[in-house]
UniProtKB/Swiss-Prot annotation:
This is G-protein coupled receptor 12. Keywords: Cell membrane, G-protein coupled receptor, Glycoprotein, Lipoprotein, Membrane, Palmitate, Phosphoprotein, Receptor, Transducer, Transmembrane, Transmembrane helix. Residues 70-78, 135-158, 221-252, 304-334 are cytoplasmic. The modification Phosphoserine is found at S330, S332.
Length: 334
């Protein structure tokens, strides 16, 4: 096991480099004088192509969200600021995956490795922290429904944004500032050049934030069910209608949290138990679903939002469909 390759987010895994060595190529191509002495062909790891494709899709989706929020003055409420933060973080994460692919095959150096891994760590950290901030905002908007739209809430939102981006940037700077395994391979994690300790801190931090999000969503479910019951009593809804509305709201919350866990939990747990000696295919197989979370985020948090849908329609066709303008919010719209 000690000779298995490790994933290098800023360079080719060793198995791919070995596959492109001259002796391997000469076995497949007949020796013809100068051809046999030419440089080996560039061998591209299919996993890296998939990660780059995922990064491209992430950039396209989240760029649309960032442009909508930036272009629409009406989308300046705390909720939209946090959604914009999430979209910007995911946009940078997708850009980091693309840059990683370009640098890994065209411009390899220690500096590019550190800058690329720093960008990826900072952007994905900001993405996860933004998800936590959105969860906190949703909880506060329900728990303090009467005083939520106040100047105090806006100030609190800006404080959260400064803290989450400041923390994420600091985490991204750690490899650049010297906390990396470029000089000591034995300290490498499953993702080079991150150290094992660095990866462990990131994984434990994720588990802590996931536990906090789980607790907040449980409280949100309780509030949603209570609100749905009160609305049903006020409007004399049937018990079946109350049940359907509540179930829809709880199902939405379960889908949000379940998607987040399914995308990030495999890579988080694998980073805790594995090290650089493990086969790289396991790292790729757990890292790829984590990138899918940045693909799904715009669908869950942005494109499902009624106000963002209206802004998108105004930008694209200059009008708002009647189905959007007449739609009323329900307790399931969380």
């Amino acid at each position: 096991m000690n000779e298995d390759p490790k994933v290098n987010l800023s360079g080719l895994p060793r198995d791919c480099i070995d596959a492109g060595a001259p002796e391997n190529i000469s076995a497949a191509v007949p020796s013809q004088g100068s051809v046999a002495e030419s440089e080996p062909e560039l061998v591209v790891n299919p996993w890296d192509i998939v990660l780059c494709s995922s990064g491209t899709l992430i950039c396209c989706e989240n760029a649309v969200v960032v442009l909508i929020i930036f272009h629409s003055p009406s989308l300046r409420a705390p909720m939209f600021l946090l959604i914009g933060s999430l979209a910007l973080a995911d946009l940078l994460a997708g850009l980091g995956l693309i840059i990683n692919f370009v640098f890994a095959y065209l411009l390899q150096s220690e500096a590019t490795k550190l800058v690329t891994i720093g960008l990826i760590v900072a952007s994905f950290s900001a993405s996860v922290c933004s998800l936590l901030a959105i969860t906190v905002d949703r909880y506060l908007s329900l728990y303090y429904a009467l005083t939520y739209h106040s100047e105090r809430t806006v100030t609190f939102t800006y404080v959260m944004l400064v803290m989450l981006w400041g923390t994420s940037i600091c985490l991204g700077l750690l490899p650049v500032m010297g906390w990396n395994c470029l000089r000591d391979e034995s300290t490498c994690s499953v993702v080079r050049p991150l150290t094992k300790n660095n990866a462990a801190i990131l994984s434990i931090s994720f588990l802590f934030m996931f536990a906090l999000m789980l607790q907040l969503y449980i409280q949100i479910c309780k509030i949603v069910m209570r609100h749905a019951h009160q609305i049903a009593l006020q409007h004399h809804f049937l018990a079946t209608s109350h049940y359907v509305t509540t179930r829809k709201g709880v199902s939405t919350l379960a889908l949000i949290l379940g998607t987040f866990a399914a995308c990030w939990m495999p890579f988080t747990l694998y980073s805790l138990i594995a090290d650089y000696t493990y086969p790289s295919i396991y790292t790729y197989a757990t890292l790829l679903p984590a990138t899918y979370n940045s693909i799904i985020n715009p669908v869950i948090y942005a494109f499902r939002n009624q106000e963002i849908q209206k802004a998108l329609c105004l930008i694209c066709c200059g009008c708002i469909p009647s189905s959007l303008s007449q739609r009323a919010r329900s307790p399931s719209d969380v």
